[in-house]
């Protein structure tokens, strides 16, 4: 099992967490080509970690880094599979708020690809709302929509657990330490 899907609602810290894994100056970004999609950047860290999207410090100003910038689930799955076939890659990480709310198709994909770790950030809703507010300069946000996503993702976590999927909870205050432990414990 080498796939790790970091899940959480808007403002939970998904992108920030993966950016922390890509701070090494030796990280490189390679554009990967999959059918019916423009090139998709993948960040390769020297320790065998690949992250779908450009998470390097140079891309920190980008609004969307992960799967949310990929137009279709088919393309997202194709790039993850392609990167996962690289024998030098020990872990493929990906995140996105849209994928965080979807269960069935990703569970099927997980089963077809040797399993996936469902890594859920447990960031409290109030913290998510505060972060979103700060990031968009204090403009009003639709708090009810964020709360709905927060609840939906909690239900997805419960469903994954009930179905016997490999679920890991990532504590929002120790997220980097927690995700590194998940990576370290890959089979």
UniProtKB/Swiss-Prot annotation:
GO terms for molecular function: kinase activity. Belongs to the thymidylate kinase family. 5-hmdU DNA kinase subfamily. Pfam families: HMUDK_HMUD1. Gene3D superfamilies: P-loop containing nucleotide triphosphate hydrolases. The keyword Aminoacyl-tRNA synthetase does not apply. The keyword Transferase applies. This is 5-hmdU DNA kinase. Phosphorylates 5-hydroxymethyluracil (5hmdU) into 5-phosphomethyl-2'-deoxyuridine (5-PmdU) on DNA as a step in the pathway leading to thymidine hypermodifications in the viral genome. The phosphate is added internally to the DNA polymer. Also transfers glutamate to 5-pyrophosphoryloxymethyldeoxyuridine (5-PPmdU) to produce 5-Nalpha-glyutamylthymidine (Nalpha-GluT). As a final result of the pathway of hypermodification, 5-aminoethyl-2'-deoxyuridine (5-NedU) substitutes for about 30% of thymidines in the viral DNA. It comes from Pseudomonas phage M6. It catalyses: 5-hydroxymethyl-dUMP in DNA + ATP = 5-phosphomethyl-dUMP in DNA + ADP + H(+). GO terms for biological process: symbiont-mediated evasion of host restriction-modification system; symbiont-mediated suppression of host innate immune response. Keywords: Host-virus interaction, Inhibition of host innate immune response by virus, Kinase, Restriction-modification system evasion by virus, Transferase, Viral immunoevasion.
């Amino acid at each position: 099992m080498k796939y790790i899907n970091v899940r959480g609602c808007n403002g939970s810290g998904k992108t920030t967490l993966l950016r922390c894994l890509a701070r090494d100056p030796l990280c490189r970004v390679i554009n990967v080509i999959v059918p019916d999609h423009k090139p998709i950047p993948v960040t390769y860290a020297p320790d065998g970690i690949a992250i779908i999207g450009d998470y390097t410090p140079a891309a920190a100003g980008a609004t969307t880094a992960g799967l949310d910038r990929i137009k279709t689930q088919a393309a997202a799955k194709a790039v993850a599979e392609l990167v996962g076939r690289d024998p030098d890659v020990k872990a493929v990480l990906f995140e996105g708020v849209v994928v965080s709310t979807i269960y069935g198709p990703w569970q099927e994909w997980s089963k077809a690809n040797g399993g996936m770790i469902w890594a859920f950030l447990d960031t409290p809703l109030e913290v998510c709302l505060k972060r979103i507010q700060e990031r968009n300069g204090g403009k009003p946000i639709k708090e009810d929509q964020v709360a709905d996503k927060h609840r939906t993702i909690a239900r997805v976590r419960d469903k994954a657990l009930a179905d016997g999927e490999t679920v890991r909870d990532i504590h929002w205050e120790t997220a980097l330490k927690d995700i590194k432990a998940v990576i370290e414990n890959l089979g």
